[in-house]
Amino acid sequence: LCLVLTFSRGAWLGLAVSVFVFALLKEPRLIVLIVILALLAPMFLPPVVMNRIASIGSLEDSSNAYRITIWIAALRMIKDYWLTGVGLGLSAFARVYREYMIAGASAIHAHNLYLEICLELGVVGILSLLWMVFRAFSEALSNMKSDKSSYLAAGILAGIAGHLFHGLFDYVWYSPRIVMAFWMYLGLMSALAWGSYTEKVAGEKLT
């Protein structure tokens, strides 16, 4: 209910991706139920929520049009600062963004996690983020083979997937709480990987 009342379409999509990924990994049969519930949702959700959902992807929606304008400006900034970025923090973004602003569309960040990371840290920063995500997904899929931790691994992977999908539409790390959640995902995944490794080493010693 709290998530619905945020009226954040990006957050709703992130949740949908998380649920789908978890079901796909652990309970594929639930996908049919999820689709049925999604089709029935318009019967129960209030019109104001349905209007928000219907506006996803609409270029006539002012919020969508605004984001696209910001993204175009951000891409132009990346073209000029692709190697080093503009510097850490929103103040660095704001200082440089003024020179690339389109049609007076002011912004305090790029409204996209990946564009913002690339703008602040350059190509090395965005590649580092993508590498961490790749490693996290690899470890999660590896731990899916373990009966002890497969559900936890699937939950972590689903959480990361939803987090990153939401990041396509907003700079989700603007909130310290959300940044903390992301690093908690990675920390839990590292703990699972270490646990699997120690169990494997212990098993080899016994044999």
State where each predicted segment sits.
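Hydrophobic transmembrane alpha-helices of multi-pass, membrane-embedded glycosylation machinery
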Residues: 12-24, 35-41, 134-136, 180-187
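Helix-loop-helix junctions and helix-breaking kinks within/between transmembrane helices
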Residues: 1-23, 27, 121-125
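Membrane-interface catalytic loops of GT-C/OST-like multi-pass glycosylation enzymes that act
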Residues: 7-10, 107-112, 169-181
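A membrane-periplasm/extracellular boundary helix in multi-pass inner-membrane enzymes
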Residues: 3-6, 23-62, 72-80, 88
